[in-house]
């Protein structure tokens, strides 16, 4: 039996720095625009597994991790099935099977928008960051297509 092991996973549990209301994840750039590291196998395992669960606290200090738009897309939302936070669980609407199964499970199910609203209520919506035109990193998908780029953050002076 040949092929990538990630394509044979039933479940994968991943962490993230940010997730947006489209279930896109960012594991490379902090909410302050600082390059944190590489994406590793995050997008590969998310795409390959039958069910991708991403865990994150709702807030990192006073910074919301659930937001309208991630700083950088490293894992596309169509490959993410469930977001688990300390304030509730959001299931991607494309996974009706999971939504139906969760109805009678007595779990704190919320929409991703509800989680974002809770985060913005507990800590203000972050101001948009400003970037230069200079690209400092390229985010590629499994097939080598460019998903996003990381630009140099403008000085805070």
Language model regions located:
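Conserved phosphate- and dinucleotide-binding cores of soluble alpha/beta proteins
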Residues: 1-157
């Amino acid at each position: 039996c040949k092929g990538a092991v990630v394509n044979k996973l039933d479940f994968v549990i991943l962490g993230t720095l940010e997730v947006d209301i489209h279930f896109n994840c960012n594991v490379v750039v902090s909410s302050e625009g600082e390059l944190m590291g590489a994406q590793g196998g995050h997008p590969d395992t998310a795409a390959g597994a039958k069910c991708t669960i991403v865990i994150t606290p709702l807030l990192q200090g006073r910074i919301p991790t659930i937001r309208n738009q991630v700083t950088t897309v490293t894992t596309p939302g169509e490959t993410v099935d469930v977001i688990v936070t300390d304030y509730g669980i959001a299931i991607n609407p494309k996974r009706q099977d999971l939504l139906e199964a969760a109805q009678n499970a007595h779990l704190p199910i919320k929409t991703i928008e509800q989680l974002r609203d809770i985060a913005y209520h507990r800590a203000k919506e972050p101001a948009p960051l400003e970037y230069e035109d200079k690209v400092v990193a390229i985010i590629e998908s499994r097939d080598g297509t460019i998903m996003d780029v990381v630009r140099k953050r403008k000085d805070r002076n």
